[in-house]
Amino acid sequence: MKVVRLHGAGDLRLHTEPDPVPGPGETVVRVRAVALCGSDLHWFSEAGIGGEKIESPLILGHEFSGFIEDRDGGVLRVAVDPAVPCGQCRFCREGHPNLCKTLRFAGHGEDDGALREKIAWPDQCLHSLPDSLNEIEGAMLEPLGVAIHAVDLGSVKLGTKVGVFGCGPIGLLVVQLARLMGAALIIATDKLSHRLEAARAFGATSVFQAENGEESREIWATSGEEGVDVAFEAAGENAAVETAVASACPGATVVLVGIPADERTTFKASTARRKGLTIKLCRRMKNTYPRAIRLVEKGLVDVRSLVTHRFPIDEYRQAFTVAERREGLKVVIEPNQSE
């Protein structure tokens, strides 16, 4: 089978390797679609993420879907949860599997991901796709799950004023969910104009170009000189964190979703302290696939429009180049494109 492995910073190579052999409780999935995530780009450009460094050639890719053959020869299409918690530790037992200390995660550390034609993965992580969802949408359920978890952390309610700082795919999904939750005001910021256009199309009521925090004054005015009740930072940049804190009203919640390249998140402490802000950090997602599937199936969230570029696995270099340049919204690689 074809496999794309990361050997070091910027060093991706196509290999031919044997098909995977499933272990106990695993099934072989023929990978249909892999959406490239910002964390994949961290691995690609920095050979690591969040303190983790590549130690041996790694297969990236954790936002994916595919199909399996059932015992009767039929085909079952599945979205695949990349996270495999132990299920036994304190955090798993208390309902926080995303915080499991021995959690396995596709395309991270020692666990190879989905940029290959086939992957053996635990049955518990396979979610059947309804007929109304295609495999591209199936791959997008993972980032939607992260956005759902972020919005859960923010406790967005009817009439809430929301700020979304960073309008990549996660930020744009947060915009859609905030609208769905009944937010009265959704302010979105980003450096890229095509992302701001998408934010407006997905339900943002006001959009502003991100310019070193200067936009916080406009946000303050737009919010009626009150600031936003919930601020979501989804850019992975300190400038966005600073703007989120500056734009939040007293007593607000700030949810940090982005992953900073330099492993540091900073903001003005006095501003956050005097406002009595609650700062929450979003760690991936937890148990969100069933909700994500229902939201897309019922047409309440649009993930299909986020996918702007699709490539076969042989064109992996071009796919990563487009994603790294942020030329579109979401890039998808299709290892079994012809099937």
Predicted regions and their residues:
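Mid-domain Rossmann-like dinucleotide-binding core that forms the NAD(H)/NADP(H) cofactor-binding site
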Residues: 77, 124, 133-213, 217
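Glycine-rich cofactor phosphate-binding loops and adjacent beta1-alpha1 units
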Residues: 154, 197, 202-278, 317
